[in-house]
Amino acid sequence: MTEWIKVCEENSLKDGDLLDFDYKDKKILVARAGDEVFATDRICTHAYADLSTGFMNTDEKTVTCPLHMSIFKLEDGVPQNLPAEQPLNTYPVKIEQSWIYIFIE
C-alpha cells in the first residue's frame, strides 16, 4: 500500500535536526537542512548503524554514519566515500498545513 504518512509538525524539526521515524518495517531518517526536508533509510548500507545518531552537514546536505564515517547525500542517498558503496533509499517529502509527510510505497 502506498500512502503519505504524517511524520511531525514542520516547526518541530529545526535546521540540522535528524529525526528517527519507524513505519511498519521501515526505519526512516527525516532531516532538515535549511528550508529543505529529506527522508532516507535510517540504517547505514555498510553496517547496521543508526544514521539518526550520526552527524549532519547542513551546507553539504549530508549525513555521516557514526560507526565508520561514511557520508551520504540526503537528496539521493548516494554514498560519498567508502566503506559504504550502496545508496540509501530516499522517500518523497511534502509539507502540507504545517505537517511533514513522507511517501512510502
What are these model-derived regions, one by one?
Residues T2, G16-L19:
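Intrinsic disorder/low-complexity signal
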Residues E3-E10:
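Short amphipathic
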Residues M1-T2, E105:
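Absolute protein N-terminus
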Residues L18-I104:
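Rieske [2Fe-2S] iron-sulfur-binding domain
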